[in-house]
């Protein structure tokens, strides 16, 4: 490990569950050393909300943060994003949270994208990286649970909710869903796992990157691996043996694996077209038709997946989780005996799924990488004073940038818009708010009825209602 390595543990609170369309409310982060000892001052700030966005009332119920509080205490989104970048981009930083790979990192990327900050470099440039404690916690429960007090839901299934785990392990965690409280709780859980299961911690830390994971994978021999993922289900500790079959035909970061506890006969018997249809059909619908789920899964090697050699799943561990190792070995033999399985699974994933057309440039982050020239010009945009943004004189290769720039100016520097641009923005804003209004009002109604005897919740809902009415005019 490099000498000046540090973790930056962070968390967002937000106004919705979709990082592409919802907005951050609060950011908190703390820098620690490799042993999770705090070495930096805690950082927390709010983000002002723009007038083209309605918050989800449910989110306010969870966090207790209102848009009015954000607008009173917060930074503009460009400042908010720049402050986060300053922390994340310090050399040899490993950015980590609790479910950050699937949520917080996505919120970061979309926030950076809207504000002309390159959305990926913070997690790989200058010796930087990322990791997710949630998957490590799942792996610890499945593979080496000793030393941790585990939490369970009423149905007896393990719970990996941070507030339940901290309570089970007597870790202070007041104000759950306050970003700073969640950061302290994440640090404490990480320290606990490193202390109680140091070998497991070190193995998955050292093997979190793409290059290390690629070394584990042998699609030619279909060498089985242990895989832990929330997609696999709590009933088996989110754990299984998988056989790596092939690399995705169009996504170099995706590995096609087969769950060796699944219905392999069905996989071998059906055509690629039949399997593709089943793969994108809801599990409940398949069950109603008496059809078994397709035992295929994509593992994204750029998302710090939990993969380890098959021997990591000890016989006694497999028994505890209800995983039949002999069934897995028998299924592996069937796969290895199939002459066309690799070709078939590649074919399944080769046909692009058709998605509804999208006219919102702000959700098009993954529609391509920006060229170096565009990245340089975006950095220039960020440095320009507001009055110069309309006469930047820069040539962009990517058509998304000019539309993003219009939104950026309209939200943060409205007075710099021409009369025609103001009319265009008013029309865009009105259309966007009207689309959100029906669900916003229905959510408020549901929540008012559900919390009719809770004055604190009703006060929050009243504030959200007043905020929404003001935006909707």
From Swiss-Prot:
Task: Please list the residues that bind substrate.
Answer: 13
Q: Where does Mg(2+) 2 bind?
A: 13, 182
- Enumerate the CDD domains for this protein: ExoI_N (cd06138)
Question: Where would I find the ExoI SH3-like domain in this sequence?
Answer: 198-353
Q: Where is the Exonuclease domain?
A: 9-188
Residue(s) at site: Interaction with single-stranded DNA:
109, 120, 124, 138, 210, 253, 302, 366, 369
Phenotype upon knockout is:
No visible growth phenotype in rich media, no change in UV or mitomycin C sensitivity, no change in the spontaneous mutation rate, no change in the rates of slippage in tetranucleotide repeat tracts (i.e. phase variation). A double exoI-recJ deletion strain has a 2.5-fold increase in spontaneous mutations.
Any binding details for the cofactor? Binds 2 Mg(2+) ions per monomer.
Task: State the superkingdom.
Answer: Bacteria
Q: Name one GO molecular function term.
A: single-stranded DNA binding
- Record InterPro entries: Exodeoxyribonuclease_I, EXOI_C, EXOI_SH3, EXOI_SH3_sf, Exonuc_1_C, Exonuclease_RNaseT/DNA_pol3, Oligoribonuclease, RNaseH-like_sf
**Domain remark text:** The N-terminal exonuclease domain and the exonuclease C-terminal domain form a central positively charged groove which binds the DNA.
**Name of the protein in question:** Exodeoxyribonuclease I
């Amino acid at each position: 490990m490099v000498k000046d390595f540090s973790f930056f543990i962070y968390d967002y609170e937000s106004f919705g569950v979709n990082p592409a369309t919802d907005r951050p409310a609060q950011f908190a982060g703390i820098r620690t050393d490799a042993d999770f000892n705090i070495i930096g001052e805690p950082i927390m700030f709010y983000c002002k909300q723009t007038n083209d966005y309605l918050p989800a009332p449910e989110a306010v119920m969870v966090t207790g943060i209102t848009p009015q509080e954000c607008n009173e205490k917060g930074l503009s989104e460009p400042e908010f994003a720049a402050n986060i970048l300053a922390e994340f981009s310090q050399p040899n930083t490993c950015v980590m949270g609790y479910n950050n790979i699937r949520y917080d990192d996505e919120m970061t990327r979309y926030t950076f994208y809207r504000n002309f900050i390159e959305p990926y470099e913070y997690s790989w440039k200058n010796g930087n990286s990322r990791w997710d404690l949630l998957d490590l916690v799942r792996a610890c429960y499945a593979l080496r649970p000793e030393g941790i007090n585990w939490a369970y839901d009423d149905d007896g299934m393990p719970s990996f909710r941070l507030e339940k785990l901290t309570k089970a392990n007597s870790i202070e965690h007041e104000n759950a869903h306050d970003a700073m409280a969640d950061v302290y709780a994440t640090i404490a859980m990480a320290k606990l796992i490193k202390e109680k299961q140091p070998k497991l911690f070190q193995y998955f830390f050292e093997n979190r990157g793409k290059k290390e994971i690629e070394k584990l994978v042998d699609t030619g021999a279909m060498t089985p691996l242990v895989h832990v993922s929330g997609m696999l289900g709590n009933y088996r500790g989110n754990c299984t043996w998988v056989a790596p079959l092939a690399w995705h035909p169009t996504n170099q970061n995706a590995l096609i694996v087969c769950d060796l506890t699944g219905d392999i006969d069905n996989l071998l018997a059906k055509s690629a077209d039949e399997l593709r249809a089943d793969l994108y059909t809801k599990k409940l619908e398949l069950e109603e038709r008496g059809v078994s789920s397709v035992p295929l899964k994509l593992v994204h090697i750029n998302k710090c997946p939990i993969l380890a050699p098959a021997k990591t799943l000890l016989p006694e561990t497999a028994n505890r989780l209800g995983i039949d190792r002999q069934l897995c070995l028998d299924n592996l033999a069937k796969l290895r005996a199939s002459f066309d399985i690799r070709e078939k699974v590649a074919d399944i994933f080769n046909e692009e799924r058709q998605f509804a057309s999208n006219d919102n440039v702000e959700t098009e982050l993954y529609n391509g990488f920006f060229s170096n020239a565009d990245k340089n010009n975006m950095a220039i945009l960020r440095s320009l004073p507001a009055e110069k943004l309309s006469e930047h004189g820069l040539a962009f290769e990517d058509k998304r940038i000019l539309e993003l720039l219009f939104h950026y100016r309209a939200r943060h520097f409205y007075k710099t818009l021409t009369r025609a641009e103001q009319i265009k923005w008013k029309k865009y804003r009105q259309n966007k708010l009207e689309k959100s209004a029906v669900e916003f009002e229905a959510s408020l109604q549901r929540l008012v009825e559900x919390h009719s005897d809770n004055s604190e919740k009703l006060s929050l809902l009243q504030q959200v209602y007043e905020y929404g009415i003001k935006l909707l005019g």
